[in-house]
Every structure is written in C-alpha cells, then in structure tokens.
Amino acid sequence: MTEPTSSTPADEEGAPASLPGRQASLSGRHGASRTPLADAVLAVARRDIASFHALPLSHGRSIRDSRVRESYEALFGAAQLAADVSYSGTMLDSFFRPRGPLREAQRLAAAGFGADATFFLSTGTSTANRVALTALARPGSRVLADRSCHQSVHFALGALGVDVTYAPMQRCCADCPRTFGDLPRLLQTFRTAVAEGRPYDTVVLSAVSYDGVRYDLPTVLAELAAAHPKVAVLVDEAWGAVHRFHPQLRPLTALHAVEHLRRTGGPLPLAVAVTHSAHKSMSALRQGSYLHLVGDGEARERTAQALFQHHTTSPSWPVLASLDLARLQAETEGEQLLERSLNLARTLRAELGGDPRLSAYRALGPEGHLTDPALLVSDDPTRVLVDISALGITAADFRRILFDDYGLYVARESGDAVLFHVHIGVDEATLLRLLEALRTIQRTYRTASAALTQGTSDHFIIAYPPGIPITVPGERLCDRTLGEIGALRSSGCEIYTLQQPGTSTATYGVPSGPAVPTTTDTRPPATVSATQAHSPTTSAPAPPPAPTARVTPATIGAPAPSRIPATPISAAPAGASAAPAIPAGRK
C-alpha cells in the first residue's frame, strides 16, 4: 500500500474519510445524530463577518441599496445569501485538504453508505465521474465501458488516452422503450479478454438508469472479480443514491454488494468507485454529489489528486452542507420516506390500470418486463413509465400541458411514453393532483382525438376565433378537414370539441359525397363539473353560437404571455371538452 505523501492534496491528517475501523466509532447513534459541516456553515452564516476576499454578495452586502435586492432575496432568501461564503482553512475547512468539519462529515457519509472513503463534490456527478476515472484508469490501460453510460464517462475516457471497448446496449422489449447495457455480453467480453491474456484494467457500469433499470451488481461485481481480481470498477449510480436506505432497494446497490463479498470472503475488485448524484434522489442541493471509494491507500491518494485536478477551487459550501444534511435524513428517515414512495408508485400503477377515467394511459412494467434473471437487471419500482399514445397527442405536448396548465413537471419522454419518478419529495397530495390532471387531460384530448379519427363527427369542432364550427354532429370528416384543423392550431387558434347539449334531431348536408343520415341525440342536458381545486378559475372567450355551455380551453401552440398559470378546464359541461387540435395524421 502506498501512503499519501506530503505533496498530496489529501495527506493522512486531511484524508477525506476514515478507514473502516475509525468509521465504526462514528457510525452508531452518536454519528447518526450529527451534521458537523452543516453546523459549521450555519455558525459562520450567523456571524456578522465582513469579507475582504471574494463574494461581494455574501450576507447580501453588495445589494443592500440595489434595485435588484428584492429579486435576490425573493430567489435566494437572506439565509442562503449568508451561507454562501468563501472561507477556507481554519476559518471553516479546506476543501482539498480537510481537517475539520468537512473531514468529519465525509467520514460520517462513508460510514453511512458503507465505503472506505467518501468525497463531497459541489460540481455534480459529471465531475465525480471524471475524478473517479482519472484515479482508476491509467493512460494506455484497457477499459471496458457500458455503452449506456452518461456522456461524462465517454468524454472523460476520450481525454485519458486509454484503450476503450464498449459493451453494447439492448432494448427492454418491443413494448417498452427502455435501453440498458447488455451485461451477459459485457461479462463474456471481459472473461474472453482475461483468457487471451489481455485483461481489462477498468470496467465502467451505469447501474441505475434514468428510465428505471437497475443492475444486479452483486452478481456482476462477483463475476468480474472472480475472473480478474486486479480489475478496478466505476459504478455510476447517479439516480440511486437513496436506495441504500431501504431494505427492498439496498441489495442491488454497489456498496452493499461489496459489503456482501467482504462478509462471505468472495473475491473483490482491486478498487470500486461509486458516484451518487445526491440531488437526484436525496434532499441535497443541485450539483451535490458523493464519490465513494472502496480500496487501499493508493486508490484514495489517486482519487484525492484527481479531485484537485478536476473540481473547482471555489466549492459551494451550501451545496456541501446539504450533502451532510441529506446523509443524516437518509439514515434516520430514509426507510420511511422510501416506503411512502414505493406505496405511491404502486398506487399510481393501480389507478392507471383500474380507473376507466384513466384508460388512455398504460403503465409499462414492472410486471412482465425485465423478469428474465439472465439479463442481470430489474426495475426501479419508484419509476413509472406510462404510455400515452391513446390520447392522440405527442409526449412532448403532454409534458408541456402538464407543466403549463397543471404545474406538474415530467422531464423524460421516450417515444409515446413519459416517465414519472416517484421520489421522496412526492407525497399523497402531489399524487392526487397528478391523477386529477391525468383524468382531465383524458377527458379533453381523447374526445378530440376520437372526433378527428372517426369517419363521421358526433361533435362540434370549433376554432376560436372566429367561433364558426369547422364540423357539426353528423358531418363527414375528410383529410381536408384535418388539414384545416392543423393549420388553425398552428396559427394559434383554440380548438374546441363539444357534444350537442339537450335532445335534438338534425340532418346535415355534406359538401361532397352521399348525404349523411339523420342523427338523433338523446343525451340529457349537460351538467357543470367542478373545477380542479388546484387550478385558478379564468374566464373563457365568448362561446360559439351553437352550444350554450361555457368552456375554458387548454391551448397548445398559441402565444400565451399571460398563461402563468393557465387553466385547462373551468366549469366544463359534462360531455363537453376543450382541446387543442390533434396534428393531422396522428391517432
């Protein structure tokens, strides 16, 4: 083992985290109740310290008489401005050679996650991946990389001067758009290289995907180490930091797998680095990241040197302090919070599968997908991938509607599916809000889609302005009609679809083709439905002449400088819906 030298950014006194023996003394009840770094940052934030160094903004000093002060305080608050400081060394701690509260916080994190060492980063897991690869993969060495890895891995490998082989990806199935690394082929490639006398020195795995695919790391790490014990492994678990803290999710995590191999006496890789985007699944500020390490002193020394090379010399102390707080919350409350997330994700799947008002949505997995143990993968049960193709609108438009009209954000779309991440910040009220939004969107858009795809309309389809029906009940739809609706939508018109209220009998002429038979509408008069509790009520434009119901449309594509927030449906009559037109040709 090579000990750190005096020129190393993290020498023995300033090592980023403790050895396992020292961890044990800090990881019990006493350690679980402490947040040393957060406490230290809070202490300096509460003092009236005037800086002659940097950060004029600290404590809001540079904006006290500024016209932008109100906006600053509205965005950040006085506490955030006070906590964003540039102190280092003994005044707070050294980021690259920690000896005080940062060192202690990193020791507690290493104990909590089960690592030999943990580094805090305030520049995200892209930086953590670069640091880890710089430490593990020497120039000229051979690297076997999971093709599904984050871009930061690919860019880092390209800059390191290593010989890279990419293991291929595979698709979940024809019905599900998720992709992931082909782990059986990766392992076979690795074993073949060992047999040929040209083993890979480093393996990179993307073990928890954005789309909710988790790798069987106990099996993968054991097979890699059995074939070549001198291999180093980087495991990117960016989306699974919190999984450590729930018994259902913990078994597949990298650090738990290493603990299991140690307990059972199985072969271990030479070094294992694990990167966690704490802000993705824990209560940490954005760009807060953990880099965990299992290995000897040389691995820790090389990691500390790489951190010095790649991390900013102006770390964010609020971000670092949030990593300390997030660790404590995960240790003391994580299991309870994750249990709620798992239950809510199950509820969402059950509602989508059993509520006829949500029949336009179809949850993809976990049942029936990724169930082949030979794939060495499984579903992340906190992710719900939902097919929305039956709505007749694109996934991109669906995301925009959720955001603009309901204040709900979904980041991921894949084909006709969108991904809901039921993380620990989603509670029962948030899920109910989502379900109500989904029901309203189904009433609105599925009606419009059906009206546009059937041969004969049983609705009024009206563009406003000018309020003149494009089609009336009983009128035949043709490609020209669909094209006209698409053009009006693109120009910013609001498109309404409304059923005829009351009881009526009418015969409508058709411009071309045979006459349309008489249609009789025996539906009862329309009734008014309640507006969603979370949506403000706004007035609709003057209704078109034929229907008497008042509706407020949900508009796609129209200029909307005042839509903050907009209302999707306000006091809409039963049997009526207000919807943007569906692009021509889409079902």
Predicted regions and their residues:
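Conserved active-site and cofactor/substrate-binding residues in soluble primary-metabolism enzymes
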Residues: A32, P36, F96, G100, ...
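Conserved N-terminal alpha-helix of the aminotransferase class I/II PLP-enzyme fold
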Residues: Q80-T127
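Charged, glycine/proline-rich intrinsically disordered loops and linkers
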Residues: S66-A83, F245-L270, P366-T371
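Long, compositionally biased low-complexity repeat segments characteristic
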Residues: T5-E13, A17, V510-A542, T548
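N-terminal "arm"/small-domain region of PLP-dependent enzymes with the aminotransferase-like
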Residues: T2-R99, V231, Y464-P466, V472, ...
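Conserved C-terminal alpha-helix-loop-beta "cap" of PLP-dependent enzymes
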Residues: T312, R346-S504
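Conserved PLP-enzyme active-site core in the AAT-like
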Residues: T125-G353
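Long, low-complexity, intrinsically disordered segments
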Residues: M1-E3, T8, S535-K587
